[in-house]
Amino acid sequence: MNELDLNQYMDRVGRQARAASRAMARASTADKNRALLTIAAAIRRDADKLKAVNARDVERARANGQDAAFIDRLTLSDKAIATMAAGLGQIAALADPIGEISNMKFRPTGIQVGQMRVPLGVIGIIYESRPNVTIDAAALCLKSGNATILRGGSEAIESNTALAALVAEGLSAAGLPSEAVQVIETTDRAAVGRLITMTEYVDVIVPRGGKSLIARLMEEARVPMIKHLDGICHVYIDADADLDKAVRVCDNAKTQRYAPCNTMETLLVSQDIAAAALPPLCRIYQEKGVELRVCPATRATLEAAGFTGLVDAAEEDWRLEYLAPILAIKTVAGLDDAIAHINEYGSHHTDSIITENYSAGMRFIREVDSASVMINASTRFADGFEYGLGAEIGISNDKLHARGPVGLEGLTSLKYVVFGHGEIRT
């Protein structure tokens, strides 16, 4: 597709999305739920067809030398298809935030002022190899009354196109515009460049991908984004920590899964409890094959306890998101030092303190400048489902517009509404 054809194609997609967004904004909850449940039924009905289409994407990815982890993300297994269908039902069961009026108050002039929750409008979703994101993102945008333009990875183009056809079927069956969810059907990477600059059509971009994708979009996008670049998450073991809790939480925060953005990457330990806390915890880490990158004080503590195989932490280790069985460990003077380290080196994603000291815990959650802050809980809980949002479209570590896991409410905004009885301003 040449540049002229691409621009014309993207403009058409944008115009259709903008028109559809107006219809979606006034769609009833019943119609939106009907669409979601119809899509779920269509996915179950066409499961074998979806697997056949997906197999072609998988075969092509293997031929291109993609690794096993990539193939796993790309594959639509029976379980993945069932999960997609079930997820649609769960989103249909969520309360519809659109049209809610809150914060109503009477003014001395006689008017009544409040806020109404409304859709953002048109949301562009850019993601990589997971075809299930096509359904997850479409469902959240649909339920929140938005239109969406989906640009998945070229490796999943056939799977994404097939899923989009089922979404269009569900929208039409509910009397909603099929253009409310559109998948960009070209694999030309220039389509991403156009999508992120279409301020006349697109209200927000939500990228779901690796650091290189997010970094590129931060450089080039003109449309506002809901995103996070890194997940450099910390757990701090305070001097007043319960050791059993510390070991249990820190083990889970690092080793339950290594790849998610809410996995702990740096462990901070108060010098007053390091000799008691570090050996039992690091023994677990080494048994599980976790490489330990340590500061000098941590090395001294662990070597005194008989540990070997430690790696000296470099300055850059405090700023790294490993997404791997690697953990940076630093012994700190105390709470002040821990908070300062997190605010200096962290990515403002998720950080947790292990302590039995109420004042220390409250200081931590007040002063650590992150989207999620926790007391005596694993960073792995930083997730829309775990927070009771039902589902999430992503996690934001920005301060505007949404922060933390982004569910239905994160895909909406508030406008002021005023009720009067003929009042005039004097």
Swiss-Prot record:
Pathway named in the protein's UniProt entry: Amino-acid biosynthesis; L-proline biosynthesis; L-glutamate 5-semialdehyde from L-glutamate: step 2/2
EC number: 1.2.1.41
A single GO molecular function term of this UniProt record: NADP binding
CDD domains attached to this UniProt entry: ALDH_F18-19_ProA-GPR
Chief localization: cytoplasm
InterPro entries reported for this sequence: Ald_DH/histidinol_DH (IPR016161), Ald_DH_C (IPR016163), Ald_DH_N (IPR016162), Aldehyde_DH_dom (IPR015590), G-glutamylP_reductase_CS (IPR020593), Glu-5-SA_DH (IPR012134), GPR_dom (IPR000965)
Keywords: Amino-acid biosynthesis, Cytoplasm, NADP, Oxidoreductase, Proline biosynthesis
GO CC list: cytoplasm
Pfam families assigned to the protein according to its UniProt record, in alphabetical order: Aldedh
GO biological process per UniProt: L-proline biosynthetic process
Catalytic activity of the protein: L-glutamate 5-semialdehyde + phosphate + NADP(+) = L-glutamyl 5-phosphate + NADPH + H(+)
Localisation per UniProt entry: Cytoplasm
Function: Catalyzes the NADPH-dependent reduction of L-glutamate 5-phosphate into L-glutamate 5-semialdehyde and phosphate. The product spontaneously undergoes cyclization to form 1-pyrroline-5-carboxylate.
Name of this chain's protein: Gamma-glutamyl phosphate reductase
Lineage of producing organism: Bacteria, Pseudomonadati, Pseudomonadota, Betaproteobacteria, Burkholderiales
